[in-house]
Structures are given as structure tokens and as C-alpha cells.
Amino acid sequence: MNDFPWLTIIVIFPISAGSLMLFLPHRGNKVNKWYTICICILELLLTTYAFCYNFKMDDPLIQLSEGYKWINFFDFYWRMGVDGLSIGTILLTGFITTLATLAAFPVTRDSRLFHFLMLAMYSGQIGSFSSRDLLLFFIMWELELIPVYLLLAMWGGKKRLYSATKFILYTAGSSIFLLIGVLGLSLYGSNEPTLNLELLANQSYPVTLEILFYIGFLIAFAVKLPIIPLHTWLPDTHGEAHYSTCMLLAGILLKMGAYGLVRINMELLPHAHSMFSPWLLVVGTIQIIYAASTSPGQRNLKKRIAYSSVSHMGFIIIGISSITDPGLNGAILQIISHGFIGAALFFLAGTSYDRIRLVYLDEMGGMAISIPKIFTMFTILSMASLALPGMSGFVAELIVFFGIITSQKYFLISKILIIFVMAIGMILTPIYLLSMSRQMFYGYKLINVKNFSFFDSGPRELFLSISILLPIIGIGIYPDFVLSLASDKVESILSNYFYG
């Protein structure tokens, strides 16, 4: 047990500081913005300090663990802890949220509430990644849904209410399955009901019961990840949300589904996961092809990027279902990699919209001459998204490939077929990304418009773009920086399986 409650402070600090902002006298939008950014920077520094001085990378067990009796009934504890699986996602959450608050500078309407919701979402996400109690995990999972709904409904586009309603129906509906799974695991695991994840990891269940629990959790995480056909909320949500909200959705929210799939389905229910993994592998492969072929048909810029996210999530599903060391490591690396790339693309799409007030690609064109800095950054990050060598996406997808090739679970012919289909998906990716860049930046449409002029990327936007680009290149050149965090934990999870 840790002496100092680092994780409790890290989880509670953003929402507490955000609540304070609501009750203090209104001092203007600029004060609210800088206050929120200072909170995020302080939180990120605190998290980094706590992990640098207290986290041992060669230890696969839970570290910085805390446990406080919360509710006597049902043996409910406030349990926190991190391991190699959660440390990367927590640091990613801090980094992307800090940059998203900086990206939200143009928001002026109800800025106090807007920034409070971003901080509340921050707490919910870090709480989900650091919870070591199943019911606490569920509470944190639900906590971040409310801010996302309000951010969508109040600061979105013309169809924001439709998108927000669709989002909450999908996510709240899937949460019912999550709650049933949580209660089922805790009540039927042993004679003594427990919500402690460490104890539940050592439990065994009747096969039928384990399959039912697995399906319940899978539905909940499939909506968040998302896995087809439960993905339809994502393009609508991204298409209408403010781009700072899109950064949080693409960078962190989707990763919660992948994290839950590894943390609960794979770690707690290994027998059921072994049975379902071939089906997940097929779904992941179809998802790559489906999203990559659907994306070029999207007129809306942000919807096209959203479908690219769905395609990239397919690699995470394949990595998880390979049940191999390289496959799972590649999936974790893809979680971090796409967190940066997805957030960056939505930010640049938003900055372009701020200038031309157009969202449909067939109305754009000829912007490269007027905004060369945004054009350059968008081109580089599009290359990162299509897995250019030297970028983080390339390494992640390559390791997932190795994971499938080395898997002992599948026949050679099925592995060759899966790899062939994945390769087709990787060929389709440059088609929709490069055509998107061509429609936006080349041609003469906007140049020929009378009195056409707008300013290029300012210092704030350039700083944001470069801040996200640096880790993408850094991970691409030296992926072991991320892989070393989770490698021992991955081996620990795979020790429950008979192959890999």
C-alpha cells in the first residue's frame, strides 16, 4: 500500500478545481481559460512526478496502490493503482486534455461551464484507467459520459442535439451490460462477494457464466472502441462536436474501450476470450476494410477522419485477439499512437473550419497557398495516420502484423488470409487520406473567390501541432519508450493462456 495518496489526488484534483471555478466570481473568459490550462499543466506535472519517482517498470504488479473503505454495505472500497497497462493511457490523457484546453481558446459562450466539463471529463477518464475496484471503474466510466453529452449538446454544430442523443443512447444503453457484468463477476466469483480486481483475476467461473459475462463486457466496450456495427454514433458525434471535444473523443474516449477489453475481458475472463478471439479477429479485419472503403464517400471532413479512426481501431482489435506478446504490445502501442494522431487531425480540421467556415470537402480547395503552415502540418500528420515509416503508426501496425504471424492459435491459411485483407486496408488508407488533402488544399476553388484571404496558423496553433507531432515521431523512432512500460504486464496477462 502506498504511503501518499498520489492517485486519489490526481483523480480528484481536476474536478475539484473545476468546481471551484463555477462558484468564484466571473472574471472574464480569458481568466477561465488560463485557469483551466494551469490546472491541466499542474495535473500533468503532478502525474509525471508521481510516476517517475514511484513507478518501477520491471514490476508487473499493481503499484501506487491505495485502498480506503468507502461504503460498508457490499464491501465497497476506493481502490486505486497503476501498472504497465494503465500508465501510458493516464499520461496520454493528461497530455491530450492539456492541449485540448489550449485548443478551446476560441470558445467564448458559457466558457466557465465548458472548461468545468472538460476538467470533470479529465477526472472520469483518469479514474477509469486507475480504478482497481470494479464498481469504482463503472462509476468513473459513467462520470465522463455526462460531460461529453453536455459538450456535444451545447457547443456542437447544427445537428448537435441529434448527435448528443445518439451518443448517450448508445453509451448509456451499453452501460447496462457493463453494470450487469460488474455485479455478476463480483457476486458469482466465489463464496465471498468481492469487487477487487486483483482477487477477481484469480477466480474461475463455469464456462457458460464466463461467456455471458464476456458478452456483456464486450458489448459495453465495443460501443466505446467502437467495433462495427456499434460504431454509427462516432461519425455523427465527431461531425458535430467542437474540435477540442473531438480531440478528447478520438484521443482518449475510444481508448477506454480498448483498455476495458484488455483489462477485464482478456485479464479476468481468459477462457471466454480464447473462445471469442477468432470472431474478434474476423470483425477487426472486416472493420479495417469497411471503414477504409466507407471513408472516401464522406463529404464531411470530420466524418472522414472519424471513419479513419474506426479503421485504425481494427488493428487494436486484431492485436488483442492474436493472444501473442507482439500482438498485444502492438495493440497497446496503437492505443497510444492513435491517441496522438487522431487528436492532431481533428485539431487541424477544426482550425481549418475556424478560417473558412466550411465542413464539406467538395466545397473546399486551393488552401495550400494561403495557409502553408496548416497545409504542411496536415500533410505530415496524414502521413503519420497512413503509417509512414518513422512515425508511431507504422511501428504499431507492423508489430500487430508480427503478432498475427507468430500466433500459435490460428492455422497458417487463416493467418495468410487475415494478413492479405489487412494489407488491402493499408492500401486503401492512403487513398482516402491523400484524396482528403487534395480536396482541401489543391485546386482553385477558394483562390478564385472574390476577397478571399485568411491568416495562417498562429503561435498557439503551431505550438499545439508541433507538441503532438513530436511524440508521434519520437515513438516512431524509439517505440521501446512505450513498449517497455507494458511488456512485463503483457507477459503476466498472457501467462493465463496456453499459447503465445
From Swiss-Prot:
Bilayer topology annotation: Multi-pass membrane protein
Q: Report the EC code(s) recorded for this entry.
A: 7.1.1.-
What is the first-listed, main subcellular location in coarse terms?
plastid
- InterPro entries, sorted: NADH_Q_OxRdtase_chain4 (IPR022997), NADH_Q_OxRdtase_chainM/4 (IPR010227), NADH_UbQ_OxRdtase (IPR003918), ND/Mrp_TM (IPR001750)
> Where does the sequence pass through the membrane?
4-24, 35-55, 87-107, 113-130, 134-154, 167-187, 211-231, 242-262, 272-292, 305-325, 330-350, 386-406, 416-436, 462-482
Catalyzed reaction equations? a plastoquinone + NADH + (n+1) H(+)(in) = a plastoquinol + NAD(+) + n H(+)(out); a plastoquinone + NADPH + (n+1) H(+)(in) = a plastoquinol + NADP(+) + n H(+)(out)
Q: Identify which top EC class this enzyme belongs to.
A: translocase
Q: What are the alphabetically sorted keywords of the record? A: Chloroplast, Membrane, NAD, NADP, Plastid, Plastoquinone, Quinone, Thylakoid, Translocase, Transmembrane, Transmembrane helix
Any one of the GO BP annotations = ATP synthesis coupled electron transport
Tell me where it resides. Plastid, Chloroplast thylakoid membrane
Q: Which GO terms describe its cellular component?
A: chloroplast thylakoid membrane
- Write one Pfam family the protein is assigned to: Proton_antipo_M
According to the UniProt entry, its GO molecular function terms are: NADH dehydrogenase (ubiquinone) activity; ubiquinone binding
Q: Per its UniProt entry, which superkingdom is the organism in?
A: Eukaryota
Instruction: Give the family, as the similarity comment puts it.
Output: Belongs to the complex I subunit 4 family.
Q: Which HAMAP family match?
A: NDH1_NuoM (MF_00491)
Q: What protein name is recorded for this chain? A: NAD(P)H-quinone oxidoreductase chain 4, chloroplastic
Q: Which organism is it from?
A: Lepidium virginicum
